[in-house]
Amino acid sequence: MANKLTPENIEAAVQHLENIQSGVTPILDGVDRTVVEDAEVVEPLDLGNQVIKKKEKRVFPLIPPSDPRLLMQIAPFMDDTLEQFGFASRKELAEVMYDNMAKYGGLGLSANQVGLPYRMFIMGGHPEIEDGKVRCVFNPFINDISEESVMLKEGCLSFPFLFLGIKRPKWCSVRYTNEKGEEIEETLHGMPARIFQHENEHMNGYVFTDLVSKLKLERAEKAKQKIIKEVQKRQNASRIIT
């Protein structure tokens, strides 16, 4: 069972995402794009007892929200499809997905968000959530959800600087296989439950903007433009100083 989170910790997690996105997402000609060209050596990824030794990062650009690959239901994951994109194993795919999630500053990242047609996502890594526990999730399925719901502000790496209040079940009982092919069943509470539900929607071709009214989305878009202008100011000031 996940550790209980205080409202302060939850807000801190959301602020963490907002802060990191502000630092790594360039604004180009008024259109949000995140393009990464560098590669770097990073620390090993610890997935439970399995330590994956990392070499150079393979970083994929985030595809735009209108890309059909983000809007279609993803077929069940099969191990024999890994070679199509140059992956030797689930563990290697998990490593690359972790690199991308960390690079873009997310709390979760689905494979189709970076153009990979796999029914899998990675989530976790934030020190305030389950002590930074990372889950690599293949073929996710939600068995049950709580009757009680909670409204919280969410972000999505596919929609930089856009934050929406989303009402979700407080907990969810889930099933999936991990990077070792082991079947996992657990009940997630608080932020992990929210992240799992968010990423699972990506598996079925939905994005979080589908869950709110047109009016609510318009208001969030206006707030987003204010954030972008502020980020542009900081980026321009940084270029002048350096």
Describe every region a protein language model picked out.
Residues 2-242:
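Positively charged
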